[in-house]
């Protein structure tokens, strides 16, 4: 004690008291300051919450925070120059989940749902609103029941607003989505890179860290909610125009992509929704996975018919053989189990049956939990609508190589639009806007038009990964699809395609498709001659592990090029696309869902228009289907409004399609080969869509147009591709081959509308194998197709039928032995029944009326569609001789000779045509129009 007391003697005592008082004062000061900060923060939070509730949680321009400088969007080089190959590099990492939730997040006052905003239709005024995410409990086979990640939450200042909310209106076919903000672009114009914005929270404890904080909310019941924070360092998002601030894309880098890849999330106009709808799923990587070694031989063979083998001497395959496996990483929480994909090593390249998908994962797909409940697909709600909408399909149908699992999980269609670098929002053509050629460049644009038969100059100005508006009908984003959809191989065939158009097609697939569903993208080069499509294309595509290039060593044409791609495809489903398209958001899953439900369904997207002059993206009518008119001319026909109203057809209803356009569709690979693929006897291009459409429908399959799948396509007035032979004759030959195999007796209707086709005597090749294939598949007749698939097509077998009357005499033509005579009319007499066919024969059974050579009297000859001496013109002669409309003119002679009746002798003969002679005027009992 004495030692202690001496410190408090004299001046030491004063210093001790001063020190103690200072410490106490400092403690009180810090406590007061902390209370002050808490009150200020609480007030700010309350004001912020009230303001966001009033404005729909929109972030104003003054609230944007800078994340990192953005790089200028890469442009395709002119004339095929190489593009940037270093920007597509990123390091594959596994998402880590750690518990770090503060009080505000647990109460949910600054949280909002991700990726689940309701789609806004372009055809009806719709109020944009946020829908809650609630999914049933999930489980995996062989494991305890675990709740599935049901929603993602982010903090307040995470996205940016580019425009104000607008109402949407009805848009007819061919109407551009953006009629304003046209751009005039010059080659020397410099574009400023848009600012990037920080994905962070003012209230989060990690606000100062350079990391993305996303809260995963797991619902165990309606009253309790647990959350975890997923922290992924050094990750940014693509510059994505999105509808709501709730929407965000969760991405993952690959080892093949390097560390300099930047992703960034942006907000755009209310009608634009370019984001991944991942709020209700396990975190899904958007990386490009490596491709396994290509098998030496594809197991699928060409069905009966000419086998088309592409040997090593015919095809050069450019590929990246990078293997991979998947592994799982569990979230360290007793109540949560999240499974993520992890790259390990070489892939076995084997297909895992869907029945095992709950315990095993495909090499290219992450593992997924399986839902306990059975939610109903939205597209199955509207069925059997007057033969126009698709019929409901039960799960009894089997997918090739796999059975549909008894209780598969489902999720909402993912709305993915991930770019490799931030988009330049002011770039020409961005968001599908029209572009105007600068006055000084019009001559150059005209000269370059012939390179692709569209505005190549503007195509090169537009970014290869431009944004386009989400044109899907309202409700598409809320539709459910199965978690274990089959993988698909995208097959694009091209020859001398425009560089920018080809790149834009590939980027649209990569940017807007769930990566685990894309097994590969096969670019089949049908012996292009352009230099930029050789080494430069190989170099550019080398940055995408899933893109492979197949080079044919000679020109085969589109049909055989597609067959080459199909033989080398490894996916469960084949998806054929043209090389000048732009796939819209959410395009792929609805197609695969239909094939998943029934392997004999062929799913087609709604094909929208990319204007060939200003490159604007234009929407089309929702209620269109592919049809044909005689002689097999493909076209689009809108379902009449009264039929739509009567049957209650909705914009999201699937449409039964009698004939598909042929350029864009998905088909089960094994079913494609069961059908015999394309007829290998078809040359180059033309008629293949008709042949496959008839084959699918008549042999037990279905063709559907899926309104929730949209793909833009450049429609050109002329085909720029060269044909080994005459283009028109090649197409006509293909159509004749199709007609001879599939149209049965209705082929006369085909020839009647293209009479020159039968006269030319085209060599269509051997049809034996195709006819045997039809018998083997036990296909229906063409009459069945007309009655059940395309009943609104007018297809009378003959032009006219019944009794054959002379107008002046009132007598009818009759058969006596093998001669033709005039008698009193008797409609019940078989001897007076005649048909006037589409190939201009007057038939009685298998006999045809014709003049006896050099005599002029008429008799019967065996019918032969190719014998011009049996053909007569009736009513069709009005085109060049309107005064002879009621006459029957014999074709074979140069002089106009007409059939004339002589009642006194009861005979018929040929005489010089006389428009005023009443005995030369005839009429059939019934006439049929088309």
From Swiss-Prot:
The chain crosses the membrane at residues 13-35. It is an enzyme of class 2 (transferase). Residues 485-594 are annotated as: Catalytic subdomain A. InterPro entries: GalNAc-T, Glyco_trans_2-like, Nucleotide-diphossugar_trans, Ricin_B-like_lectins, Ricin_B_lectin. Its main location: Golgi. There are two conserved domains in the glycosyltransferase region: the N-terminal domain (domain A, also called GT1 motif), which is probably involved in manganese coordination and substrate binding and the C-terminal domain (domain B, also called Gal/GalNAc-T motif), which is probably involved in catalytic reaction and UDP-Gal binding. Catalyzes the initial reaction in O-linked oligosaccharide biosynthesis, the transfer of an N-acetyl-D-galactosamine residue to a serine or threonine residue on the protein receptor. Has activity toward EA2 peptide substrate, but has a weak activity toward Muc2, Muc1b, rMuc-2 or mG-Muc substrates. Belongs to the glycosyltransferase 2 family. GalNAc-T subfamily. This is Polypeptide N-acetylgalactosaminyltransferase 5. It comes from Rattus norvegicus (Rat). The lineage of its organism: Eukaryota, Metazoa, Chordata, Craniata, Vertebrata. The gene is Galnt5.
